[in-house]
């Protein structure tokens, strides 16, 4: 086994209620689809993986989409390093909310741009689509971000969405001249840990869940 430094990436999944944020996260972490909708308050998950031959520890915060929890948004927006902006392609309202999330993130970060990916979820329901792929791409171009369509049910592009966000954070690190940094949602004691990582460990994932009441 060789010692390697493992970078932790603080990813935040945001979007309106019922768009499939939790389903995307659970599909990535545990490899199964949630059949029943149970509104999330705030859940945190961790997964170790390899992206472009580099080991990464994903620290993923799955957030509440319901309006009654909107007061919590600025707290996680301050600490996130990258954001998945999720809407459902069969919901025009959820698509229109993406701009609100993007503007709030930039305001909290006091930045003109920040690592984000726009995600059009529920691709398996594309027969009920009310938001075209072209509209999603146009909004992403306006924001200077990528657009990807996913299905938590069929696993379509689920890994790609999260992994592309990590790639965007790496680009930001390089642009800012940062080698490593950040903290963890799970323990807040530092983002970079020296770990013994072997070939058999690289694909292993771990999950820790906590609900903030």
From Swiss-Prot:
Entry GO CC: plasma membrane
EC number(s) on file: 3.6.5.2
Propiece residues: 211-213
Keyword Signal found: no
Main location: membrane
Motif (Effector region): 37-45
Lipidation (S-farnesyl cysteine): 210
The keyword Lipoprotein is assigned to this record: yes
Catalytic activity: GTP + H2O = GDP + phosphate + H(+)
An individual GO BP term: signal transduction
Membrane topology, as annotated: Lipid-anchor
Keyword annotations: Cell membrane, GTP-binding, Hydrolase, Lipoprotein, Membrane, Methylation, Nucleotide-binding, Prenylation
Domain of life assignment: Eukaryota
UniProt: GTP binding residues: 15-22, 62-66, 121-124
Function field: Ras proteins bind GDP/GTP and possess intrinsic GTPase activity.
Protein family membership: Belongs to the small GTPase superfamily. Ras family.
Name this protein carries in UniProt: Protein ras-1
Organism, scientific name: Neurospora crassa (strain ATCC 24698 / 74-OR23-1A / CBS 708.71 / DSM 1257 / FGSC 987)
